[in-house]
């Protein structure tokens, strides 16, 4: 008797697809996170099987999944935390969907990855958390670009920053008072991106220190700086948005 191997082996969720989702999708597609649906369990993934095939096989253009826009044949190709899919992984997804998206043997399912949604700090529990003002975006609102009020960081002394991470918060409830409801358009959060800096002002309101930080986009990983090149956060800094883009999520 001969077993099925290589390209002829059946592709299953537990053995083949779950590891792909864990590595490349579940950073956003988990409960209470940015994506419009969770893709953790087979029951969650199965209704989206055809959509997953389509969204992962569109090619290197905007809006493909996972969002990773590095050109495959130009420049540096080896990046930490690269979520892009290989040709082999894309082939597995296609074969799995075309074969009816079978579940497979539960024993093949890999251990689950740590889940925390938007409350999980990728770089560990922070030493300092700064909370900006709240925004309410109506369900039928047009896109908005602007600035937010200066927000005191809360540091009373100069500090070198090892890592910085921005989290969005969505506290809009559905009819059942469930903040995890995902019936939205394009995701749970209304933030698209924010260009931000920190500044120190003197008693006359004049800028005496200014530091630029990595632009924030929804789903962005924490930015960790080299120990030899950490950024200085001056005492009594304030967070200043140079440009904030908000959009409705349909709720």
Where are these regions (language model features)?
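Aromatic- and Gly/Pro-enriched helix-to-coil junctions and flexible linker segments
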Residues: 1-151, 163-167, 236-242
């Amino acid at each position: 008797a001969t077993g099925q191997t290589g390209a002829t082996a059946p592709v299953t969720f537990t053995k083949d697809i779950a590891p792909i989702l864990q590595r490349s999708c579940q950073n956003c597609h988990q409960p209470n996170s940015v994506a419009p649906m969770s893709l953790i369990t087979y029951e969650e993934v199965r209704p989206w099987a055809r959509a997953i095939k389509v969204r992962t096989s569109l090619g290197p253009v905007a809006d493909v999944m996972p969002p990773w826009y590095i050109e495959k044949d130009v420049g540096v190709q080896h990046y930490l935390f690269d979520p892009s899919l290989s040709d082999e992984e894309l082939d597995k997804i296609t074969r799995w969907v075309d074969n009816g998206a079978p579940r497979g043997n539960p024993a093949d399912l890999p251990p689950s990855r740590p889940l925390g949604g938007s409350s999980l700090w990728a770089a560990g529990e922070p030493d300092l958390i700064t909370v900006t003002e709240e925004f309410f975006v109506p369900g039928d609102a047009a896109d908005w670009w602007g600035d937010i009020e200066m927000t005191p960081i809360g540091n009373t002394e100069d500090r070198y920053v090892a890592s910085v991470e921005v989290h969005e918060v969505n506290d809009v409830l559905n009819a059942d008072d469930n903040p995890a409801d995902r019936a939205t358009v394009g995701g749970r959060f209304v933030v698209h991106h924010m260009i931000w800096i920190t500044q120190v002002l003197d008693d006359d309101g004049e800028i005496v220190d200014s530091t630029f930080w990595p632009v924030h986009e929804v789903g962005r990983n924490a930015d960790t700086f080299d120990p030899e090149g950490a950024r200085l956060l001056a005492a009594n800094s304030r967070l200043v948005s140079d440009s904030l883009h908000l959009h409705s999520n349909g709720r």
